[in-house]
């Protein structure tokens, strides 16, 4: 049952991330809009994870589905890394540095803030 909980949560999180990328996609700025979608997904997943870790749910399978499944499927380190490399390859070093810095700072901040708010 744990496997099913993670699989369903992961499928839902992945579909959320894909939907967000479709919602924000623009043909005239594909890397910019893809990076924005990844940033939003990672920050939102970090916030959800922070809140869930501060107040674990009584149902361990639901907790597993949300933490490992949804947060894991919604966030993406691999896409974030690939997009940062693409910014460098286009010669946009400052955008790459800004993207990496914003992604890390906002994700850590969102997770810490959500944890603090939920832990009260």
Explain the meaning of each model-derived region.
Residues 1-120:
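Membrane-interface helix-loop junctions in multi-pass transporters/channels
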């Amino acid at each position: 049952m744990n496997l099913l909980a993670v699989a369903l949560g992961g499928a839902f999180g992945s579909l959320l991330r894909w939907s967000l990328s479709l919602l924000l996609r623009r043909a005239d700025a594909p890397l910019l809009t893809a990076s924005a979608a990844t940033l939003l997904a990672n920050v939102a997943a970090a916030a959800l994870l922070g809140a869930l870790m501060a107040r674990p749910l009584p149902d361990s399978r639901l907790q597993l589905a949300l933490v490992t499944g949804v947060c894991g499927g919604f966030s993406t380190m691999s896409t974030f890394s690939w997009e940062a490399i693409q910014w460098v390859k286009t010669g946009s070093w400052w955008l790459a540095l800004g993207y990496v810095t914003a992604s890390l700072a906002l994700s850590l901040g969102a997770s810490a803030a959500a944890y603090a708010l939920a832990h009260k």
